[in-house]
Amino acid sequence: MEPIITFIIPSIARLTLLRTVESLKNQTDPNWKSIIIYDGVDGPDFNDERITIVKSPKVGLEGHKNGQSGLVRNIGIKESKTPWIGFLDDDDTIHPDYVNKLKNSYNDKDFVVWRMKYENGLVLPPIKENTINFSRVGISFCYKQTLGEILFDNNRDGEDFDFLMKLKKLTNNWSITQEVYYNVRH
């Protein structure tokens, strides 16, 4: 079966990347792939063990010299061919049922904002809040490519929120999950 989602992971080769990729490999539904775009790495010849150890048929590697998270994510967006695009930072993890839940509960939506939990227990957006507000949402979302090529603003604070605002202008068919399936720095 073809992957339904590509996870775009900008990275500076943190040690936490291994844990991030492991959270993908632990998915109960195997229909995913990922592209890790190494920021500050020039060319396809990656020699750092932290970089080469994560490569597999489901995990592609790209390099970009001197980018910012928005620019680096845009490289991944342009490379993605799956129906859905999702985002994951290299020090975060996702719940093992993320892909399965997307496919079976949210596939009729155009984009999904997953509630995220910080190490201190803070959940954003808060459980009773079903709106997207600045500083109360992060990169814990995915969207369908049928909305068109939407890109992040380069080198800008708040690029995650701005991207979500672009999505909201295109569709009213979206959801904030009740599930907390994205873990920040876990």
Task: Give each language-model segment a name.
Residues V112-P126:
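Short beta-strand-to-loop element that shapes/binds the nucleotide-sugar donor at the catalytic cleft/hinge
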Residues M1-S23:
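N-proximal low-complexity "stem/linker" segments adjacent to membrane-targeting elements
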Residues P44-K78:
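Active-site-proximal specificity loops/subdomain of glycosyltransferases
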Residues P30, I36-N47, P57-K58, T93:
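A conserved acidic beta->alpha catalytic loop
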Residues D92-S105:
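Acidic donor-binding/catalytic loop of UDP-sugar-dependent glycosyltransferases
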Residues I85:
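Short aromatic/hydrophobic "clamp" motif used to bind/position activated sugar donors
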